[in-house]
Amino acid sequence: HKYRLKNTTGLSLNSLVDFEDPIDILTHLMVGSEGTLGFVSAVTYNTVPEYPDKATALLVFRNAETCCRAASALRSQPVAAVELLDRRSLRSVQDKPGLPDWIHDLSEDACALLVETRAPSSESLDEQLARISASLADFPLEQKVDFTRDAKVSDQLWAIRKGTFPAVGAVRPNGTTVIIEDVTFPIDQLSEGVTRLQ
């Protein structure tokens, strides 16, 4: 139905006909904090501490299924961030400066996790790294940049992640579109979801 299409030049008023409850109508007319039919007068941020000690790793698994199972295992671990990068996204940035040479030789099904953990002290970080490593011991790796505390190496690893969208967009075939929508899956369906998206 044409009125369901995303419209970036106007305001969709479908909520006036799609909903009967006044609260539903009003909440579907609100557009973030842009002031459309309302504004945000107060915001409460729940922040997380920026700990001085941190370590970052790039762990490459043989396939998306193993990678996703490892991501599930990390769910209960003291990690601050876990980003999944499939082979296509890794290929798009493999020629960037500072990346390991082995990235060119990864298998077609390779899938990586960029993992970061942070702690209030070096001793706490050591304990966290031991826990994280133990949780991943049963997942075979194809390659890795092991956990490093070196800020320069960490920045290079995060540059991989940050560079994937523009790089993927640059190498896509003419006439195709890059979709930058977030997708979510229940953690127990992550592997199947990622595999089906590929």
Language-model features: locations:
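Noncatalytic alpha-helical scaffold of FAD-dependent oxidoreductases
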Residues: 1-198
